[in-house]
Amino acid sequence: MPAYRSRTTTHGRNMAGARGLWRATGMKDSDFGKPIIAVVNSFTQFVPGHVHLKDLGQLVAREIEAAGGVAKEFNTIAVDDGIAMGHDGMLYSLPSRELIADSVEYMVNAHCADAMVCISNCDKITPGMLMASLRLNIPTVFVSGGPMEAGKVVLHGKQHALDLVDAMVAAADDKISDEDVKVIERSACPTCGSCSGMFTANSMNCLTEALGLSLPGNGSTLATHADRKRLFVEAGHLIVDLARRYYEQDDVKALPRTIASKQAFENAMALDIAMGGSTNTVLHILAAAHEGEVDFTMADIDALSRRVPCLSKVAPAKSDVHMEDVHRAGGIMSILGELDKGGLLNRDCPTVHAETLGDAIDRWDITRTTSDTVRDFYRAAPGGIPTQVAFSQEARWDELDTDRQNGVIRSVEHPFSKDGGLAVLKGNLAVDGCIVKTAGVDESILKFSGPARVFESQDASVKAILANEIKAGDVVVIRYEGPKGGPGMQEMLYPTSYLKSKGLGKACALITDGRFSGGTSGLSIGHVSPEAANGGTIGLVREGDIIDIDIPNRTISLRVGEAELAARRAEQDARGWRPTEVRKRNVTTALKAYAAFATSADRGAVRDLDAR
């Protein structure tokens, strides 16, 4: 029987000093021997997805203590990718994932916590905490802050649903007036919560449901809705039960590595492909699998992408559909339910809240449940009132969206497309693979060939796009923006948004060893591996080279002969794999430390301590 980890600091004569310090935090004699649960919060006033989390940590703590545990809260950092976008701040976003994972490990191991509740929400926070949970392998429940309500605005007599990306695109569109841009800006992000589309934050919070590490509704219940409070309350009680199951009954099904098995990762990736999740999720899923010592690779993702159809399209792929609409259609459990009906899911994986994922789907899928409580839960609607307060409204939809032929969630028999929402491409330009969000690609450009327009940085590409130097048919190549070359693997939301604003969203391609925001749409191919800084072929592309992209056949090729590529490689080896232009970029010691150990995207951009 495993001993409670916390006994290291709470039992024995030699721990008198430690107990004295615990007492100074409020613990009493009766608390020693109870499971000590870390409440890992990520409250910050910098990030709208986290502004409402301040009191939620203590809400969970109270429920933990009511259930017989001892709760101790601490905070991690949280970077807002939208605010950090378009300047050197974006260099810090992906590295913050590792910093978050490390800080959770430091706090939990230093104080010998027995289990943890992870209160996350936005882009790198959920992945960082997920990596930590699999690294530590102690009982863990995830509960996120929830999605933002979609913005609503009336322009020229017509109502539009909005999100952050709409504001960025409008600002770069010369045809939209300053006044309309101001209206869109003020309406795009009306409430607290993670940005309202199927961007990275919401994608990752949805995937925790498929992995079995969070409660049903975690990915889709609005941050503002009173129903979301139940998730926090239940998480507090559930984590104490999981801790007791493991430490007192030796039940390994309470541990993250048992729950998040290879089969669970296959479920999560199947969901990601079916819902057209952010391409960033591929990075994070690979990194989490690495931490859990799960043999899950790009090859597994490629295999899944060839057989899992696209069952849902949400902004940015479908601009008028947001997370509130996914929830009304039954949320993640209903997408999983459709995958289950199609034989595309592993039903037997355990979860933190049900014996198996199959049991959970049978109860929580609105098309098969017999529970009025479950159906009412998914009727939770946006309140339509700007606020930064959690659980502040109780609006309900009159009806659920159960239309599986034409609704927000489709059946396997009536998919948006038979090919899934994400695809892995390979070829001489990306020997180890690259990723495209096919759910956001217009059917007319699934096969595309064009001349390369080569840029050594995101900034240089943006200047060219805004100066109207990019023409229909071009392939924009942005390199030396990978994990090592950036460093930090910046998101390319501004280049893709500006292409869209220039009317080139369906007329150009963009290829990079960097990555894309979950808000990106169009023929945007990222994570090219190996990256340029690691000797990848993308570093050999020259202005005017023809690049061929074939999504149906999963290929991406540089139309240059092997002899010429060999000559270019020898030349590049001699000069070093670095940008040909000097970049005005402040690469600090912290970023240099990250770059020293960063791997390319096909490995999840994890650190390789044997790399030096």
From Swiss-Prot:
Active site (UniProt):
S517
State what protein this is by name: Dihydroxy-acid dehydratase
- Protein's job: Functions in the biosynthesis of branched-chain amino acids. Catalyzes the dehydration of (2R,3R)-2,3-dihydroxy-3-methylpentanoate (2,3-dihydroxy-3-methylvalerate) into 2-oxo-3-methylpentanoate (2-oxo-3-methylvalerate) and of (2R)-2,3-dihydroxy-3-methylbutanoate (2,3-dihydroxyisovalerate) into 2-oxo-3-methylbutanoate (2-oxoisovalerate), the penultimate precursor to L-isoleucine and L-valine, respectively.
Which InterPro entries does this UniProt record tie to the protein? Answer: Dihydro-acid_dehy_C, DihydroxyA_deHydtase, DiOHA_6PGluconate_deHydtase_CS, ILV_EDD_C, ILV_EDD_N, IlvD/EDD_N
Give the EC number: 4.2.1.9
Copy out the cofactor comment: Binds 1 [2Fe-2S] cluster per subunit. This cluster acts as a Lewis acid cofactor.
Q: Has the keyword Transmembrane helix been applied to this entry?
A: no
Keywords on record: 2Fe-2S, Amino-acid biosynthesis, Branched-chain amino acid biosynthesis, Iron, Iron-sulfur, Lyase, Magnesium, Metal-binding
For this protein, the record's HAMAP family field holds:
IlvD
> Per the similarity annotation, which family is this?
Belongs to the IlvD/Edd family.
Q: Source species, please?
A: Rhizobium etli (strain ATCC 51251 / DSM 11541 / JCM 21823 / NBRC 15573 / CFN 42)
